[in-house]
Each structure stands twice: as structure tokens, then as C-alpha cells.
């Protein structure tokens, strides 16, 4: 008989049979519990909370309505603009001066012309009496008309056909000078320039005089 059997060891250590039964039952209980207990789920690693990213909100920029910014011209541009403005003013002044001088010259010319007309009117009007003998003397009569002199033509000493030719020539001359020709007697014609008027009675009374001042 072995000395290491279960009963001998239990008696040696003072363990009763009830205690043996307790251990046997406990082992059976643990075995049944292990069989009946559902398998434990493997412990999942605790998910780490992701670091919350800082959300960036794009806040709309507040734009304040304001007047448009006007760029100031550079110094060179301002200088060019100032020169241009000065040239414009100088040109306007020059043009005004030229216009003023022209007006003054026109006024002076007008005054001179009026003075000349007054002087011409103040001059003694002369009537020249001519008794032509040939047609060629018609040119001499025309020269007196161009000199703004009245001419009293007496055709008593010229033939009739040449007298008609002279009258035709003098008619064209006074027409060109805006003058006048009129018959003041049987064989006497009065030719006057544009700035002179003589009545026929005066011309007939002075027909025998070569020059008459009035």
C-alpha cells in the first residue's frame, strides 16, 4: 500500500471527506460554467478619439462700400498737365490778342476809309467840257470818268457817225463804273461817275464854260 494515496494524505493533513467533495464539486462547477458560458468576445481596443480638427470657417470679408480710390497723378504727369494747361491759356490769350488786333486794324481801316470818303466828298466836284472831233478822243473822256470827274460832251464839231460811236463807247464806260450818261441838249451829253449827280438844267446853263466848280 502506497503512502501517497489520496486518503492517506487527507488523513495526514486533517482534511475530511466533505472537503474533498467540496473541491470535487467546485471543479465540476467550474467545468460546467466554462462549457455553458458563451465565449467572451475579444476585447476590442478602445477607439481613440480622433483629435478634432479645428474647423476653419471662412468668414466673408466685410466690404465697406466706399468711394473709388482715385490714383493721384504722378509728379511728371502733373507737370505735363500744368504745361499743357499753360500752353492752352497762352494760346487762348494769343488768339484773343490777335482777334483784338485784327478788330483794331479793321476799325482803323474803316475809319480811314470813312475819312477818305469824307475828304473826297469835301473836294470840289469838277465838270470838264470836251468837244471831240474824232473817235479817238473818246479815250480821253473815259480817263476823266475814271478820275471821278463829270464830263460834258459837245458833239457839234464831230461827224454824226463818229458821234454815235463815241456815245456807244461812253455808255459802256459809265456802265462799268456804275455811273450815268444822259442827253442834256441836241448834241450835248453829260457823263457822271457813281458818286456824282447833276441835273440837266445846270448842265445846259454851263455848256459854254470849259470848267465849272460847284
Swiss-Prot record:
Signal peptide: none annotated. GO terms for biological process: division septum assembly; FtsZ-dependent cytokinesis. Residues 24-120 are annotated as: Disordered. Residues 30-40, 69-98 have a biased composition (Basic and acidic residues). It comes from the Bacteria. The keyword tRNA processing does not apply. One of its GO terms (cellular component) is cytoplasm. Coiled coil: none annotated. Its main location: cytoplasm. Residues 55-67, 101-120 have a biased composition (Polar residues). The keyword Transcription regulation does not apply. It is found in: Cytoplasm. It holds the Pfam family SepF. Keywords: Cell cycle, Cell division, Cytoplasm, Septation. Cell division protein that is part of the divisome complex and is recruited early to the Z-ring. Probably stimulates Z-ring formation, perhaps through the cross-linking of FtsZ protofilaments. Its function overlaps with FtsA. Homodimer. Interacts with FtsZ. Belongs to the SepF family. This is Cell division protein SepF. It comes from Enterococcus faecalis (strain ATCC 700802 / V583). The gene is sepF.
